[in-house]
């Protein structure tokens, strides 16, 4: 079983740690300020996400079909919702500082350009 872990390092790079290749993180993208992932749970035998929860709400030992929005089973995950913010490497591109509320709820006032990308992806092997 291979595990692929994506995370943002302290150096603002998005990394991939792939256990099937090596235990050395591979940098993928520079200047990533934030990455958020939530899991879409299909409740009561439905095939679409009824709610989205963070990994902290997932319970490894929970039986399939018993998920709630406060405690989910990994086997009930049918989609993921992701959101990440990237910024320019030059922090002086804009003529004046712009107030920007990032994904983590922090106000940023430097002169860098930023873009937030978000989306939902269905896990096809989970939907009938």
Spell out what each predicted region is.
Residues 1-2, 7-128:
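Short linear sequence signals and composition-biased patches located at protein termini or domain-edge surfaces
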